[in-house]
Amino acid sequence: MGYKDLPPGKNPPEDIYVVIEIPQGSGIKYELDKDTGVIFVDRFLFTAMYYPFNYGFIPQTLADDGDPVDVLVISREPVAPGSVMRCRPIGMLEMRDEEGIDTKLIAVPHEKLDPTYSDIKTVDQLPEIIRERIKHFFEHYKELEPGKWVKVENWRGLQDAIEEIKKGIENYKKGGK
């Protein structure tokens, strides 16, 4: 069984699986190759920055950019690339980059994995400093890469994240396999 066989969650869109590609604290961007199912080094970040939290995607989804729905998982520890985390969405960050709309879902580990975030139901309940770190990272992590840029537009709440997941699942069912 590979990642293509993994469902989008235990009870999506509220209870999702996230395949971790990039561990918290990494200065390397890893990416799962769709054809082989192997995680490749995409690039070393040109900036002296690191991913503030674990980063991955929801399997069997397709976002507007043609890739699976991206997720940043707020967590206490780095998680190995290729691991699957059961998560709960809490919101999303709308951005644009050189290729167009680039939305990032924000999630927390399911309470059975880590109860630390069980009281956080929406992105607005995260401490302001966490939201600022996330925003700062995405605004600056591509700065030294020729021709690349990012503009953070705004934070969206839980309901928008739920709709984004539903849309990603539907897009996948319509031919994203």
From Swiss-Prot:
List locations, semicolon-separated: Cytoplasm
Q: Which GO terms describe its biological process?
A: phosphate-containing compound metabolic process
Output the Gene Ontology terms for molecular function: inorganic diphosphate phosphatase activity; magnesium ion binding
Which positions bind Mg(2+) 1? D65, D70, D102
Which reactions are catalysed by this chain?
A: diphosphate + H2O = 2 phosphate + H(+)
Name the Enzyme Commission number(s) assigned to this protein.
3.6.1.1
Gene Ontology terms: cellular component: cytoplasm
Residues that hold Mg(2+) 2 according to the record: D70
Keyword list (alphabetical) reads: Cytoplasm, Hydrolase, Magnesium, Metal-binding
| Cofactor(s) in the UniProt record | Mg(2+)
How is this protein organized at the quaternary level? Homohexamer.
Concerning its family, UniProt says:
Belongs to the PPase family.
Q: Which NCBIfam families match?
A: PRK01250.1
Extract the PANTHER family matched here: INORGANIC PYROPHOSPHATASE
Q: What is this protein called?
A: Inorganic pyrophosphatase
Identify the taxonomic lineage of the organism of origin: Bacteria, Pseudomonadati, Aquificota, Aquificia, Aquificales
Q: Which gene encodes it?
A: ppa
